[in-house]
Amino acid sequence: SLIACDRNGYLEESMKIATDENGKIKHISKQIAEDEYYAVSIDVYKLNADAAGILSREIYDTIEVKKSENLWTEVALDAIFSKTVFAPYEICGRWFEIDNHDDLRRAEQIFKGDVI
């Protein structure tokens, strides 16, 4: 399983990932310090069948059993890193995170004229 990430700078407001000595992801959180982070997550995930099942059970347990309905998906991801392997997938090239219409307009201006 993979988490797409960007190594081009620490962003305080973004989810960061930390890796172990083997390069596998061990933690994802906004609170990871700059001297401990490996990269910034861009919130794109590729899960193998094993990880998808484990994550599904973790989310079910969080919502249905623990009754915690206001947590990010990353909280569940962080809880399963000890149960399955995730590696960082470093993106390259230009990209821009779009969370709302204002971000979309800004991205359109930044990438205006780019050929795909």
Language-model features, listed with the residues they occupy:
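Conserved core of the sugar-phosphate nucleotidyltransferase
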Residues: 1-63
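Conserved alpha/beta core of the MobA/IspD/sugar-nucleotide pyrophosphorylase nucleotidyltransferase superfamily
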Residues: 38-116
